[in-house]
């Protein structure tokens, strides 16, 4: 699989470094890859002795109508914290469209990040800041391991992590970020 914890940490660290120390993480579940991404995000948000409570993990429905209803209910809170990290590009882009329909400017009023670096992350406006995972490398690793196991080889490590990296685009307002 991919290193979901690292991806979550990279997003959290980036938002924290931009001054969004109260950012919220949004996912459809609190298990598996979503949970690993949340734990990484949470860890990054706890720099400088700060605490990131479970209330900053928002679980949204699989159903679009219910998700949009949740975004509407939480809109004042979202605008207060000014940054949202989504566990998928799909949900991030859907939320961006919802916010734009409400007249909210991205990233000026709210910064948004996704996860996956899907093809749509570059097509949406503003272009989505996200975590890139190399799907072809992931498939290659899986196939290679499968062939080795089929040949009778005993593999020592069953869970190999494919590296991920942050892709900075236009959906985050980089306030308080030092120039490098």
Locations of the language-model features?
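Short, well-ordered alpha-helices that flank and scaffold nucleotide-derived cofactor binding pockets
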Residues: 13, 17, 39, 43-47, ...
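Short acidic capping loops at alpha-helix termini that bridge into adjacent secondary structure
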Residues: 22, 52-56, 105-112
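Hinge/beta->alpha junction and helix N-cap segments in small-molecule ligand-binding domains
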Residues: 1-10, 26-70, 85-93, 115-118, ...
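Alpha-helical recognition/docking segments in bacterial nutrient-uptake
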Residues: 1-13, 17, 73-80
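Flexible loop/turn connectors
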Residues: 68-180
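ATP/adenylate-binding site constellation spanning eukaryotic-like Ser/Thr protein kinases
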Residues: 20, 38, 125
């Amino acid at each position: 699989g991919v290193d979901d914890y690292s991806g979550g940490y990279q997003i959290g660290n980036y938002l924290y470094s931009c001054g969004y120390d109260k950012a919220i993480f949004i996912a459809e579940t609190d298990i598996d890859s979503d949970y690993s991404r949340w734990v990484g995000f949470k860890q990054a948000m706890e720099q400088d002795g700060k605490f990131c409570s479970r209330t900053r993990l928002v679980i949204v429905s699989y159903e679009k109508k219910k998700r949009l209803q949740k975004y509407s209910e939480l809109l004042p809170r979202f605008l207060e914290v000014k940054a949202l990290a989504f566990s998928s590009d799909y949900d991030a882009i859907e939320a961006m469209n919802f916010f734009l329909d409400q007249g909210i400017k991205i990233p000026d009023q709210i910064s948004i990040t996704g996860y996956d670096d899907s093809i749509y992350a570059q097509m949406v406006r503003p272009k989505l800041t996200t975590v890139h995972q190399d799907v072809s490398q992931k498939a290659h690793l899986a196939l290679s391991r499968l062939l080795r196991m089929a040949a009778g080889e005993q593999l020592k490590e069953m869970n190999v992590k494919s590296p991920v990296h942050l892709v900075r685009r236009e959906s985050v307002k980089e306030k308080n970020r030092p120039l490098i």
